[in-house]
Amino acid sequence: MTKGILGKKVGMTQIFTESGEFIPVTVIEATPNVVLQVKTVETDGYEAIQVGFDDKREVLSNKPAKGHVAKANTAPKRFIREFKNIEGLEVGAEITVDIFAAGDVVDVTGTSKGKGFQGVIKRHGQSRGPMAHGSRYHRRPGSMGPVAPNRVFKNKHLAGRMGGNRVTIQNLEIVQVIPEKNVILIKGNVPGAKKSLITIKSAVKAAK
């Protein structure tokens, strides 16, 4: 069965194992998520649970949003997402970090840091041209393709806006879970800036 929770990225640190191994970890704070709705095939056409995370002031919510969360007897939520293939939860139930344990393999989704308008070298990793005095080609995008089509093909690597995309990193290991602090430590780095929304789910390609 799939397990999932929403959290916020706190930052990175490092821990040492009992054997002295150094492990860089990302700290994710995941306060209890609340099940706001249970979707079924009969009513919605598919099965899923809708989860809310991070309370916000009622003055910032409209009447439909307040009525929606009232069914779960909770405060309005800043982030609402869905998880599929999760069973046994009812409206109003809480999902806490202790659904995961050290050693679990998960997929982590976040929004990558926005870098603004960047050239092809930074954005796509292209090599620059010669920097010699006689060269007139340094950081340009290169050939636009053959003459015959009379156009530039789609997906040509060009300068443009970089970052700010939804990114999923698969098969990351959970190093430690601290239930009393609502914290999960994940090995390595995860996409996103500090305080950004992070989705943690059971890995779909984990070795069985």
UniProtKB/Swiss-Prot annotation:
Start and end residues of each stretch annotated as Disordered: 117-147
Keyword Metal-binding assigned: no
GO biological process: translation
Pfam families: Ribosomal_L3 (PF00297)
Gene Ontology molecular function, alphabetical: rRNA binding; structural constituent of ribosome
GO CC annotations, alphabetized: cytosolic large ribosomal subunit
Family listed: Belongs to the universal ribosomal protein uL3 family.
Functional note: One of the primary rRNA binding proteins, it binds directly near the 3'-end of the 23S rRNA, where it nucleates assembly of the 50S subunit.
Family annotation (HAMAP family): Ribosomal_uL3_B (MF_01325_B)
Protein name per UniProt: Large ribosomal subunit protein uL3
